[in-house]
Amino acid sequence: MLSKEGDFSKEQRERLSHFVTNLDSPIFALKNLPEVVKGALFSKYSRSILGLRALLLKEFLDGEGGDFLSEDLQDCELGIQKAADFYRRVLDNFGDDSVGELGGAHLAIEQVSMLAAKVLEDARIGGSPLEKSSRYVYFDQKVNGEYLYYRDPILMTSAFKDTFLDTCDFLFNTYSELIPQVRAYFEKIYPKDPEVSQSAYTVSLRAKVLDCLRGLLPAATLTNLGFFGNGRFWQNLLHRLQDNNLVEVRNIGEQALTELMKIIPSFVSRAEPHHHHHQAMVDYHLGLREQLKSFAQRYGEEREPSLEKGVKLVYGDPDGLYKIAAASMFPYSEHTYADLLDICRKIPDEDLMLILESSASSRENRRHKSPRGLECAEFAFDITADFGAYRDLQRHRILTQERQLLTTKLGYSIPQQLLDTPMEAPFREAMEKADQAYRLIAAEFPEEAQYVVPLAYNIRWLFHINTRGLQWLCELRSQPQGHESYRQIAIDMAKEVIQFHPAYKSFLKFVDYSETDLGRLKQESRRKA
């Protein structure tokens, strides 16, 4: 392996120094290389006896692939194209999907609806999304006299155009008008402590006000997202975007493909409309959706849908504690998992509890992760809560979440702080107006009707998660600085699991059950200190 001092000539070392972080250590990083060149380099790496630096020299710096180093723009693009051609051959001819994870791209996706943002964030593995916050950013701005929300072309050319526009404008007007009223009210009931800085108090108060009013924003509200994803992530996401039922989502898919083809073409070319892989994927998705939809309608029509709200544990693994104990001991044993399970079932309960407690007792804070053995016990929940809370919790990825259409049929949530205040009536009026508009539009356009539904309305989703993931989620999302809506969901999930079996309490010991006023005040005070 060419990596030791003296293996490279002085000239080679000079050339390599521009592209690797060191020339001698067996651990180094790449730099100053196009994504497609890095991807092609790593693809060849897995089939070569050479070290990566030697391979970089042979294939790209000294070979024909070195054209990308040229100061001449055309030669540079030619070199990148050669790397891209190789990469495409690997992907198409050998089917090595994993090489699609060897490069990636940052993509800004701006001025898309909050509804579409959820479709984008459905993609779980290989990508990292970041979205404009409804907690720190006011959504009351206008551009050219219009509030910033998505105007779906189907609705805008339908008989419901005026209903849609009037309702969204009414929701935004109510949101804008209530901001100063709620701020003044909170200043009165949550006065500033003399020991707290004005800046920390202001930030916390603003978060509280916007948390309280975000439920008025319709799902059509425009937001911005930033994504980093590897090539495989982008390819899979582009397939799904381009076969979505919503025009907006399909347009996002087309535009995203156009931009990604400019920087990582080899990674996403199989998502181009004319590519046989893409068309086969679209046909598969469409056929599967139609089949499952028909089954859901056929077998669900005789039962009235539940209107129950909140968190309900649907399934808890009856052997979960045995599985956790056995899997936690497995790396340190010579027995099979099956034998360890049998042992755990037969030992006295107090001994089983000792094993379980050992996986939890040494944790000093929520960032101390428990053993992976906790991943062997799983839970499933039905959750019916406001769409705003779903938007926050949906970003957790090491689990399974499936949502139903956003409607007004499951009612809405109103912040406790607004009850019995002058702000309650306008909030409820806005909800009722949105409900009327939704029901009119949904009769003809059930998917497009989602755009007019405010974030305060409830949505139902399935939440399937293992104990380790549940531990992370509940302990994180129950912290006082969180939004009260998802805080309550996290707390209720923890309570449901502990009620299922008290032994799980030791795994959830950093869940915060406290009631808070200005939840972010402590965190902001630390930030300003």
Swiss-Prot record:
Source domain of life: Bacteria
GO molecular function: flavin adenine dinucleotide binding; NADPH binding; thymidylate synthase (FAD) activity; thymidylate synthase activity
Keywords of this entry: Repeat
Every ThyX domain range: 38-274, 309-511
Pfam families in the record: Thy1 (PF02511)
PROSITE patterns, A to Z: THYX
Gene Ontology biological-process entries: dTMP biosynthetic process
SUPFAM superfamilies according to UniProt: Thymidylate synthase-complementing protein Thy1
InterPro entries, per the entry: Thymidylate_synthase_ThyX, Thymidylate_synthase_ThyX_sf
Family in the record: Belongs to the UPF0159 family.
Name of the protein in its database record: UPF0159 protein TC_0921
